[in-house]
Amino acid sequence: TDEHGDKIVKAAEAAGQTPQEFVDGISGQFQALWPKLGIKHDQFIRTTDADHKARVQAFLQKVYDNGDIYFGEHGGHYCTGCERFYTEKELENGLCPQHLTKPDFIQEKNYFFRMSKYLPWLAGHIRENPDFIRPERYRNEVLSMIESGALEDLCISRPKTRLEWGIELTFDKDYVCYVWFDALLNYISALGWPDGDKYAAYWPGEHLVAKDILKPHGVFWPTMLKSAGVPLYKHLNVHGYW
């Protein structure tokens, strides 16, 4: 279960609980559901697991040491539901395109991942490997995102003065990791990256995602992996809403 971020804090407050109490309850419901569906899992992953936190911090440090994380100031339209910033061009009549709600404008100092450094490489990789993102309509959508010139470097932190519920940055203890950067890493942290037996056996893997999270999986994730020197996933298989 993906357990960090602004919306978890807000939901916990509404329920009169701490974030940890809230996610423990929700995660427990998911774990209780699987046997009822006749499904047995090998390992249930939570992004609040100590092992996951340690691997996220190791990955962040690797990207930082590679010179791909810098400190800067950013102002943008932030949707709590999506837990991401939107550019003016991405908004629809000033509203979040997913939730149709007005995002908050937030101006603050944060850490950024040099995603733009890897966008030309990513576009080339997608063109050279036509089935990397499938079906074709979503491959074309990702290429359009990259080649539009609208993508900026990725803000990968939140100041503790605004949000304490997250994984602390090793290189600045006044900040926590942005939830998407943290959550995407469970694909490899669950396998014991960088040296676990399961990681060696099962990665690179296949991804199956819904169309609303195409950008994090089709743009954020492969550039993160490239920066850290981790092999890319085999394919990104995208479906509409079920």
Model segments located where?
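N-terminal, positively charged nucleic-acid-binding surface of large information/translation enzymes
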Residues: 1-132, 151
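Structured secondary-structure scaffolds
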Residues: 51-55, 106-242
